[in-house]
Structure formats: C-alpha cells, structure tokens
C-alpha cells in the first residue's frame, strides 16, 4: 500500500541523513526505525478509540488506515516498525530476525513491541509506545517485561 511505501521512503531518507552524521552503526538503524515509527504513527489512544468506535470488535481494520489517520497504539506501532525492519532485511540493510511480541500483565494490561535478534543472538527491543530502543539485557527494572520465558535463563547468567 501507498502509506507503507511512503513511510519506508521516509525511513530510507532518514537513514541517509543519519549515515552522514553517525556512520553506518547498527544502533542508528534501530533508532531510525524507532523515530520513523513514532513520527509516522503517533501514539494516540483517544484518537484510535474515536476512529474505531463505529467498528464491531471483531472487525479487522487495516494498518494503513491508522497510518493515514496518523494515530495508533502499541500494536499498530509494533506492526509498522516490524514491517520497516522486514523491508530493511529484504533490501539487505539488516540480516537478523524480526518479530512482534506481546504479553499481558495482570491488573496492568496488554502491550506489544518489536523484537529484533541479530544473527549472533543479541536481542534488541524497539518500543515506540514506551519510548525504548535498546538491548534486552540492558533494560532497567522500571521498563515493561519484554523477556520471553526462554530469555529468563540467559538474562540470569
């Protein structure tokens, strides 16, 4: 869809600018995805509620609708960011694996984010809604619980 291509083009333009300032470091790629996702799909739960009030709870609404309306919540941002990383992977800019992870914490709620794993197994979290981009093993305790059950053994070492 046109909306996705526009956001991807914005990302590539930002990458060119960032490469002139910061070089080709890998972290700047993740930072660019983080920033373009936030800019292209600002977090706005109230606007999302207004946009979806006329839809039945089981109705699927396309992501490009939220991009066009410039409003999303964590799941929309995670989907867009993962799409951008997959596109970068397909075009040869990165070579790790990308997923959208989510969980629910009792009495707190659910949340979704992007997980990127490098070929050597280093895990990065990109979470525009919670304002975080960085390594899983460097996350402070006040952050969301991003670890998968199999990550816990590795993180305790």
What are the residue ranges of the model-derived segments?
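A glycine-rich, coil/turn loop motif that links secondary-structure elements
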Residues: 67-71, 103-105
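Active-site nucleophilic cysteine motif
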Residues: 29, 33, 69-85
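Functionally constrained cores in energy, signaling, and assembly domains
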Residues: 64-69, 112-115
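Secondary-structure boundary elements
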Residues: 2-64
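Generic low-polarity alpha-helical segments
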Residues: 5-14, 29, 33-39, 112, ...
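Long, low-complexity, Gly/Thr
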Residues: 63-65, 81-84, 157
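Hydrophobic/aromatic-rich core segments of domains that either
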Residues: 76-153
